[in-house]
């Protein structure tokens, strides 16, 4: 999917109006920064730069997109011709991914003519806002976990493309793996997974489900133990995988209480 129409209409109408007034070619500097952080947060973590640079490199208007803009009378024909020839020729510089940022600090600076810089505004903010928010939250989790590895498994709770960005952002912040295969393919992130309750219910018993999973994936797999009774599920998981059991997963109930009980 292209990136050119992943923008707000007014970005293009501003360019259209600026072309009419002859100001679209004026050199400008745009800075990306946050005014404040959420309460209780002392810093944020930058992520999304790599995804953004890829998006800028691919930023082209297709013939179909240009026809849409013309048919919808979004901009004038001369502006459509400018869009047809558009290639970003400015400069982009800023923080590296994984670095911390604070309110007022310029995370990213885009320099170029007004038209070629402002056309990227929505795309820049869309990617950096989301990815940096995920990375900032993930960094706090990594800090709390200490030496224990964390895996990102949030794909089903995000829009499908955002899930890839979230997996990448979490990995940048220190997560060890993701369940998202597209993130693994595109960005080389280690992938992992467990099993769902449906897999357990597919079998005649929890023991049979665990045995099938261990037979397929080895004892180092992670077994889901809360389909029925957690305490019994843990016992069955250990019996199925032995001392080489990778981990058990709890997906419901009061997690802080149950996790502490299982670890004990």
Protein language model features and the residues they cover:
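Ordered alpha/beta subdomains of enzyme catalytic regions
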Residues: 1-216
């Amino acid at each position: 999917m292209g990136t050119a129409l992943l923008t707000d209409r007014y970005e293009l109408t501003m360019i259209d109006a600026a072309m009419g007034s002859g100001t679209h070619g004026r050199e400008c500097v745009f800075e990306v920064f946050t005014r404040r952080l959420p309460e209780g947060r002392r810093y944020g973590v930058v992520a999304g730069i790599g995804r953004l640079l890829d998006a800028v490199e691919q930023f082209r208007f297709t013939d179909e997109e240009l026809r849409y803009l013309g048919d919808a009378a979004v901009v004038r024909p001369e502006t459509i011709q400018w869009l047809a020839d558009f290639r970003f020729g400015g400069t982009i510089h800023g923080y590296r991914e994984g670095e911390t940022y604070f309110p007022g600090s310029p995370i990213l600076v885009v320099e170029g003519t007004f038209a070629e810089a402002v056309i990227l505004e929505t795309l820049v903010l869309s990617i950096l806002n989301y990815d940096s928010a995920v990375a900032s939250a993930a960094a706090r989790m990594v800090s709390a976990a200490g030496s224990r590895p964390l895996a990102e498994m949030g794909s089903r709770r995000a829009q499908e493309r955002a899930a890839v960005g979230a997996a990448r952002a979490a990995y940048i912040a220190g997560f060890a793996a993701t369940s998202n295969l597209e993130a693994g393919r595109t960005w080389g992130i280690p992938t992992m997974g467990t099993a769902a309750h449906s897999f357990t219910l597919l079998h005649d018993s929890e023991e049979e489900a665990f045995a099938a999973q261990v037979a397929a994936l080895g004892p180092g797999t992670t077994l889901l133990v809360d389909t029925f009774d957690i305490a019994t599920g843990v016992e069955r998981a250990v019996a199925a995988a032995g001392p080489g059991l990778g981990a058990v997963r709890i997906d419901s109930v009061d997690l802080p209480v149950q996790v502490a009980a299982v670890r004990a």
